[in-house]
Amino acid sequence: MTNIIQEIEQEQLKENIPHFRPGDTVEVKVWVIEGSKKRLQSFEGIVISIKNRSLNSSFTVRKVSNGEGIERVFQTHSYSIDSIFVKRKGKVRKAKLYYLRTRTGKSARIKERIE
């Protein structure tokens, strides 16, 4: 029984997902349906958490727009995600960056990781 479920999950996993970690700045292109129109919407921000659960994997992206913090949770293997681009790699020492919610200005900056 579990083999059948695992086979179905393996078929639905996306293969073209780039490797990114918390602290990285990513741009996610998402398909948005408005009425009968379908268009791509871009969301760029810092990855503050990643949950790895095979098909149910997700990641949270945070950006600040007009002084308001906006967080969006994306399902990693969702069909609504068109592409993910890693713009900048961040150097952090934690897996969850929830402390960025309370910080503003220079204290919310993340150093760049050079590899």
UniProtKB/Swiss-Prot annotation:
The keyword Ribonucleoprotein belongs to this UniProt entry's keyword annotation: yes
A UniProt-annotated Pfam family: Ribosomal_L19
Keywords assigned: Ribonucleoprotein, Ribosomal protein
GO process terms (BP): translation
HAMAP family: Ribosomal_bL19 (MF_00402)
Protein name: Large ribosomal subunit protein bL19
Hydrolase listed as a keyword: no
Cited function: This protein is located at the 30S-50S ribosomal subunit interface and may play a role in the structure and function of the aminoacyl-tRNA binding site.
Family to which the UniProt record says this protein belongs: Belongs to the bacterial ribosomal protein bL19 family.
NCBIfam families according to UniProt: rplS_bact
Gene Ontology cellular component list: cytosolic large ribosomal subunit
Gene: rplS
Xref: PANTHER family: LARGE RIBOSOMAL SUBUNIT PROTEIN BL19M, RIBOSOMAL PROTEIN L19
GO molecular function: structural constituent of ribosome
